[in-house]
């Protein structure tokens, strides 16, 4: 399986977990409001709370942990959304930017072509000598850049498969070593997920930046 798909799947699972946690939190808040009302369910809840005080205890706990729950759910949505939606679009975003850059180069070539042709003129038919060489390099850039962009794209995909496979295999080992006998719990999961997300972003951008790097370095 392509490592990029594995990264996206982890983002999907994270977003589903965040949505489930948000749903549970909203349900708990709704039940708390029902208890405060005078509906049939609210009256029964008031009677049960008067006998056991469980309702007041749960309301106090929910009120105390609400900021932490909201923060954790928000972090999970951001990290999960980054892995699930943004990361798979990075190759297209970079490719689109490179294509627009090539169109700009074509526009520059259209403007510069008459000037380049003018440099070939001379009273003795020899033109302006070595000053015309820049035009040939520019023409080569216009013609060859799309092919080199495709080469860079495939090189980036191959590099991502190698680097992503290595990351997915080694990250779990590094995590197990770092968390040996640790009991930090849910907050550590969020921080490690943030570390993994940042490493994935760096990897994918570094690999598919070859779409831009290969033409610039070759031409």
Feature roles, as predicted:
Residues 89-103, 107-108:
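Juxtamembrane interface at the cytosolic side of transmembrane helices
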Residues 103-107, 146, 206:
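Generic structural signal for bulky hydrophobic/aromatic residues embedded
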Residues 108, 147, 151-154, 194, ...:
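Residue-level signal for the membrane-embedded core of alpha-helical transmembrane segments
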Residues 102-110, 152-162:
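Amphipathic, heptad-repeat alpha-helices with coiled-coil/zipper character that mediate oligomerization
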Residues 1-92, 121-138, 157-219:
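Gly/Ser-rich, low-complexity
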Residues 106-125:
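Outer-pore/vestibule module of multi-pass helical membrane proteins
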């Amino acid at each position: 399986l392509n490592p990029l798909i594995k990264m996206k799947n982890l983002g999907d699972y994270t977003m589903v977990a965040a949505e489930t946690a948000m749903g549970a939190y909203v349900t708990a808040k709704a039940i708390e409001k029902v208890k405060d009302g005078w509906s049939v369910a609210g009256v029964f809840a008031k009677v049960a709370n008067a006998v056991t005080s469980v309702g007041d205890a749960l309301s106090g706990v929910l009120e105390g942990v609400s900021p932490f729950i909201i923060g954790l759910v928000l972090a999970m949505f951001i990290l999960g959304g980054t892995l699930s939606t943004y990361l798979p679009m990075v190759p297209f975003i970079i490719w689109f930017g490179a294509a627009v850059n090539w169109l700009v180069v074509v526009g520059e070539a259209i403007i510069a072509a008459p000037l380049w042709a003018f440099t070939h003129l001379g009273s003795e038919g020899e033109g302006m000598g070595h000053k015309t060489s820049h035009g040939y390099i520019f023409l080569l850039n216009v013609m060859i850049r799309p092919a080199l962009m495709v080469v860079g794209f495939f090189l980036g995909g191959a590099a991502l498969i190698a680097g992503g496979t290595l990351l997915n295999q080694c990250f779990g080992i590094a995590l197990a070593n770092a968390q040996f006998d640790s009991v930090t719990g849910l907050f550590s999961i969020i921080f490690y997920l943030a570390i993994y997300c940042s490493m994935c972003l760096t990897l994918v951008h570094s690999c598919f930046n070859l779409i831009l790097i290969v033409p610039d370095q070759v031409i």
